[in-house]
């Protein structure tokens, strides 16, 4: 896609009979030479963005993502509040996604949860921490409640920093992807606002794939409400955190074998259509799956070797 160091000029010359775009760039390439784009039914519901793509959207039956977490790094399932006497929200997303509306929304959450803190991590904070603290101060949040981290030496330190967060907050309208998977893997539930396009629905896709649909907010007020409810229900929050890695490990999001089969089946369908002028079969004919609701706020809820700077 249209990201740094892309090779779209090469692909525009159609070096292969079938070309597919996937991951990294959450939109169309605009190139007629690219035939397909991998996605799923949550990130791109049928009929919502099809006409806006030069590619044919090929929706994988589960998630368009597959994640493999680092098994050697232990997730801290205890709450930071136990040690620090306050709930800590957090986001490790690119701060370009943290818009004025996001800052205003997160500030409302901090106001509603007394003494709560917000931990932010992005390489830009090495030089701009004071600027972002000032933005929150303009919303009435004192600087001591905003903790900023810049780049860390390696992936291990990066992942361990999630252990300082109790609840993750997904930015909008541009959600996190890798950061959401990392947070969930490290036992941090993430609240995400359901948007109108792929970039704003990735969080919902990830949460849906691991069965945490009640962390998907329908609107900003619901987003704030979910964050407050979760912060005020410490027993439930601990239960969810204790079970979160296992939930991920047994979900379609981390099922590499079946994900590979879905991709291989898609390739077969593409080639069959290419050689036989045949319409794609079941992968494109499935109905849009409804996001099922799980009442995680009820007492019945029970489930719940990369290196370098990060």
Task: Set out the residue ranges of the language-model regions.
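Active-site-proximal region of nucleotide-activated glycan assembly enzymes
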Residues: 13-79
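C-terminal amphipathic helix plus adjacent low-complexity
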Residues: 93-95, 108, 124, 129-134, ...
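A donor-sugar binding/catalytic signature common to diverse glycosyltransferases
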Residues: 1-16, 20-31, 154-202
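Conserved catalytic-core segment of nucleotide-activated headgroup transferases in glycan assembly
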Residues: 62-153, 157, 161-163, 280, ...
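Catalytic binding pocket for nucleotide-activated donors in carbohydrate/polymer assembly enzymes
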Residues: 143, 171-256
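Generic, well-ordered alpha-helical scaffold segments in large soluble proteins
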Residues: 105-112, 135-139, 161-164, 168-171, ...
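Generic beta-strand/beta-sheet core signal
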Residues: 22, 39-40, 92, 121, ...
């Amino acid at each position: 896609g249209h990201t740094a160091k892309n090779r779209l000029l090469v692909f525009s010359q159609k070096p292969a009979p079938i070309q597919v775009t996937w991951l990294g760039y959450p939109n169309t390439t605009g190139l007629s030479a690219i035939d397909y784009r991998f996605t799923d039914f949550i990130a791109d519901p049928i009929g919502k963005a099809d006409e806006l793509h030069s590619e044919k959207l090929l929706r994988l039956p589960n998630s368009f993502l597959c994640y493999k977490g680092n098994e050697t790094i232990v997730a801290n399932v205890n709450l930071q509040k136990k040690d620090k006497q306050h709930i800590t929200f957090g986001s490790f997303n690119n701060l370009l996604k943290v818009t004025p509306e996001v800052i205003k929304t997160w500030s409302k959450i901090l106001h509603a949860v007394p003494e709560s803190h917000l931990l932010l991590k992005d390489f830009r904070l090495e030089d701009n921490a004071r600027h972002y603290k000032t933005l929150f101060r303009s919303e009435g949040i004192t600087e001591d409640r905003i903790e900023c981290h810049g780049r860390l030496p390696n992936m291990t330190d990066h992942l361990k920093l999630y252990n300082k967060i109790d609840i993750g907050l997904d930015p909008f309208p541009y959600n996190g992807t890798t950061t959401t998977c990392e947070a969930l893997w490290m036992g941090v539930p993430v609240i995400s606002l359901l948007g109108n396009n792929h970039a704003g629905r990735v969080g919902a896709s990830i949460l849906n794939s691991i069965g945490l649909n009640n962390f998907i907010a329908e609107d900003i007020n619901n987003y704030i409400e979910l964050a407050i409810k979760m912060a005020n229900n410490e027993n439930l929050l601990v239960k969810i955190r204790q079970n979160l890695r296992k939930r991920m490990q047994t979900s379609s999001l981390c099922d590499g074998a079946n994900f590979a089969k879905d991709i291989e089946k898609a390739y077969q369908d593409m080639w069959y259509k290419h050689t036989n002028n045949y319409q794609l079969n079941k992968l494109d004919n499935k109905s849009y799956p409804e996001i099922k609701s799980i009442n995680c706020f009820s007492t019945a809820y029970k489930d719940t070797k990369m290196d370098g700077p990060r």
